[in-house]
Amino acid sequence: MLIIPAIDLKDGHCVRLKQGIMENATVFSENPETVALHWLDNGARQLHLVDLNGAFAGKPKNGEAIRAIVEAVDGRIPIQLGGGIRDLETIEYYLDNGITYVIIGTAAVKVPGFLHDACYAFPGQIMVGLDAKSGKVAVDGWSKVTGHDVIDLAKKFQDYGVEAIIHTDIGRDGMLSGLNIEATVELAQALTIPVIASGGVTNLDDIRKLCEVQSEGITGVITGRAIYQGSLDFKEAQALADQLDAATI
C-alpha cells in the first residue's frame, strides 16, 4: 500500500482546500518544490500533484510550480498530475517533461472519446480521477454533481485501458473526517484495475483500516491535510502500511 502525499497547487503555492472549494484554501508553502523534496526525504515513493487553478479553468495554470517540482524530484520517484488536462497535446507535453502519470477527471466524463484516445496514445500512463458525492460523479473542480454512477463509469473507463482509478469522496476531502472505505471497497470490487483512495484520511487508524481491505484491489491512498497539519505522520503511515503488507504475504 502506497501512502501518496498530495501537493495541491493554487497560484503557484502549495495549498489544501476544504471540500474542493477554492475560497477555502489554506496555504502550506509558497515553495512547492521544497514540499516535494520534504516528502521525498521522508520516504515517499510517489507524489500526487493537482493544478487547482487548471481544474477550474480547464487548462494548465501552474506550469512554473510543476516544472520546479519535476526538476527537484529529478526522476527519483513517479509523479502523477491532474487538473485542467483536456487535450492530447497537454498530456504529451507533461509526459515528455517528467510527469509519469496524467490524471484525467472532468474531460473523461464529458468527452469519453478523449479518454479513449488518451489511453490508446499513452498506454499505462493515464489514470482517471473520479470525484464522488453520494455515489455520483462530480466535475469541473467538483462544482457540479452529475447523474453518472461512479461504478458504472469506472467499469467503462477500465475497458478503455486506464492504469488506475483515483476515487475521491468530496464530502470528506480536506475535512479530516475519515475515509469512505465502504465506497472505495465497493468500487475496487467491481474493477480489475487498481483503485487509489483519497479524501478524508485523518490518522493511522484510517491507514490500518484501508490496509485490511487492500486485497480488494486498493493499491494506495492519497493524503494531504492530515500530513500537513500533523494528525498523520507520513513516515509512520508508510511504515505501518509496509508492516501490514509484510504480514499478509
Swiss-Prot record:
Molecular-function GO term, any one: 1-(5-phosphoribosyl)-5-[(5-phosphoribosylamino)methylideneamino]imidazole-4-carboxamide isomerase activity
A Pfam family reported for this protein in Swiss-Prot or TrEMBL: His_biosynth
Active site: 8 (proton acceptor), 131 (proton donor)
GO BP terms: L-histidine biosynthetic process; L-tryptophan biosynthetic process
Reaction catalyzed: 1-(5-phospho-beta-D-ribosyl)-5-[(5-phospho-beta-D-ribosylamino)methylideneamino]imidazole-4-carboxamide = 5-[(5-phospho-1-deoxy-D-ribulos-1-ylimino)methylamino]-1-(5-phospho-beta-D-ribosyl)imidazole-4-carboxamide
Entry-linked InterPro entries: Aldolase_TIM (IPR013785), His_biosynth (IPR006062), HisA_bact_arch (IPR006063), Isoase_HisA-like (IPR044524), Isoase_HisA-like_bact (IPR023016), RibuloseP-bd_barrel (IPR011060)
EC number(s) recorded for this UniProt protein: 5.3.1.16
Catalytic class of the enzyme: isomerase
Gene Ontology terms: cellular component: cytoplasm
Pathways per UniProt: Amino-acid biosynthesis; L-histidine biosynthesis; L-histidine from 5-phospho-alpha-D-ribose 1-diphosphate: step 4/9
Parts of the chain that traverse the membrane: none
The keyword Cytoplasm is annotated on this UniProt entry: yes
Locations listed in the record: Cytoplasm
Alphabetic keyword roster: Amino-acid biosynthesis, Cytoplasm, Histidine biosynthesis, Isomerase
Family annotation (PANTHER family): 1-(5-PHOSPHORIBOSYL)-5-[(5-PHOSPHORIBOSYLAMINO)METHYLIDENEAMINO] IMIDAZOLE-4-CARBOXAMIDE ISOMERASE
Similarity comment: family membership: Belongs to the HisA/HisF family.
Name of the molecule in the record: 1-(5-phosphoribosyl)-5-[(5-phosphoribosylamino)methylideneamino] imidazole-4-carboxamide isomerase
Species, as recorded: Nitrosomonas europaea (strain ATCC 19718 / CIP 103999 / KCTC 2705 / NBRC 14298)
